[in-house]
Amino acid sequence: MNLQQQLAYCQQHQQRLQLRHFDNETAWQLGEKIKRQAEKQGVALAIDITVNHQTLFSYAMAGTCAENQDWLRRKRNVVELLSTSSYAAGLMLQQRETSLDARYGVSLRDYAALGGAFPLQIKQAGIIGSVNVSGAPHLDDHNLLLQVLADFIGLPTGSIELLTPLTPLSV
């Protein structure tokens, strides 16, 4: 899958993975679902769900460390800045051959355009926050969020195209 294909999929994902409502109980249910999926995949994650700058769910699985919390914060900041997933932001920057600090003037100590943070969007209302994970390779973090969100909103298994590592454009 090349860069253009991945960007197109990221746009589709953000359009399709919208919720009808979201409250504190929803955050708890989604966070638990992410934890169970991580356990099933054998990966230790730090998990954070933030709405309107308030943390509604936070959990650090055994095997994570304080560094994972920092990655959560940095990825979440990208969603808040650009209103797109942290993975899609990285792809857009790569396409434009630039970086967060060069394009937006932000510190890379506070922002990370790597997979693992996804906007929480309410249908017909907009983005209210983000769901964030850290602990696996960043593409795996992103794909885990796609899987869990798709299942959480009731999309059929396999209806969301998971992303694969980038391949160069063929000439």
From Swiss-Prot:
UniProt-listed Gene3D superfamilies: Haem-degrading domain (3.30.450.150)
Domain of life: Bacteria
Pfam family, one: HbpS-like
Family named by the database record: Belongs to the UPF0303 family.
HAMAP family: UPF0303 (MF_00761)
Name of the protein: UPF0303 protein YPTS_2661
Organism encoding this protein: Yersinia pseudotuberculosis serotype IB (strain PB1/+)
